[in-house]
Swiss-Prot record:
It holds the Pfam family NAD_kinase_C. It comes from Lachnoclostridium phytofermentans (strain ATCC 700394 / DSM 18823 / ISDg). The lineage of its organism: Bacteria, Bacillati, Bacillota, Clostridia, Lachnospirales. PANTHER family: NAD KINASE (PTHR20275:SF0). One of its GO terms (cellular component) is cytoplasm. Its main location: cytoplasm. GO terms for molecular function: ATP binding; metal ion binding; NAD binding; NAD+ kinase activity. Its cofactor is a divalent metal cation. The active site is at D64 (proton acceptor). This is NAD kinase.
Length: 285
């Protein structure tokens, strides 16, 4: 790899010290580096839309939220992403700041792989009509939760048009394998290797003894319907995609979820397996 761009979260790297160190290190090794305006250093700057198509890798400094946002911004450019963890757990990040230079040495020696990971599309239906303007893609998850301080909500889960679960609770998470270590994990859902092609459906605090996580193939379609409550209110629930896009839902609204055509590409260095990452993040030796 010879051409890079750097996207930094200034809330995580306030004085851009880490960004500056990385820029100098890459340029000292003969690499061409672009830095987004949000990162604002000296040199060749560009916003995300102006990043040249021949950039081979986007280096993102921040937590998982920063990496997710950058991945969405760069999706149409099809640029692989290498995350540098400035957050807490950082499951999407490949590099820790303390081992940054050693990690980049592997990159320069072509000791890496590019993982192509599946995404999911979510389309909202209101009164039976698809809101095409509200079709969004998720790298991690689509989360449907109760609105504000409302009561628990009722949901119906359909797979390929067939109802499989009805329950009341705080909501439901539909996640990709990449998102299985996020909110899905916190809600008691399964951990799935990110190379898998499947969709996880995990209830959030269900008021039921029978509601459990369900795993389906990537060829299946999942549909969530908001059920009517005894005391219907204007805003029953909220759907959130990758922690950013959100939309209010009413009773009988539906969300159709299926595998997306787009895929996100993440750089993985040799010797950094998913299971090694799990042991490291969870503190197991």
């Amino acid at each position: 790899m010879k051409k890079f761009c750097i996207i930094a979260n200034r809330d995580k790297d306030e004085n851009l010290t880490i960004t500056q160190t990385m820029l100098e290190f890459l340029e000292a090794n003969g690499k061409t580096v672009y830095v987004t305006e949000e990162s604002c250093l000296e040199g060749s700057y560009t916003d995300v839309s102006g990043i040249p198509k021949d950039v081979e890798c986007a280096i993102v400094l921040g937590g998982d939220g920063t990496i997710l946002q950058a991945a969405h911004d760069l999706l149409q450019l099809d640029i692989p992403i290498l995350g540098v963890n400035l957050g807490t757990l950082g499951f999407l990040a490949e590099i820790e700041t303390l081992t940054m230079k050693q990690a980049f040495s592997k990159l320069f020696l072509n000791q890496y792989n590019i993982e192509s990971r599946m995404m999911i599309d979510a389309t909202v239906f209101k009164e039976g009509q698809s809101l095409s303007s509200h079709k969004v893609s998720a790298i991690n998850d689509v989360v449907i939760t109760r609105s504000g301080f409302s009561r628990i909500i009722g949901v119906s889960i359909f797979i390929n048009g067939e109802v499989v679960q009805n329950y009341r609770g705080d909501g439901v998470i539909i996640s990709t394998p990449t998102g299985s270590t996020g909110y899905n994990l916190s809600a008691g859902g399964p951990i799935v290797t990110p190379k898998a092609e499947m969709i996880m459906i995990t209830p959030i605090c269900p008021h039921s003894l029978n509601a459990r996580s369900i795993i389906v193939t990537s060829d299946d379609t999942v549909e969530i319907q908001i059920r009517e409550s005894k005391k219907t209110q204007e805003e029953e629930a909220i759907v959130t995609v990758d922690g950013s896009f959100s939309m209010e839902l009413q009773a009988n609204d539906r969300i159709l979820i299926k595998k997306a055509k787009e895929r996100v590409k993440l750089v993985r260095l040799e010797g950094h397996s998913f299971f090694h990452l799990l042991r490291t993040k969870f503190g197991d030796k």
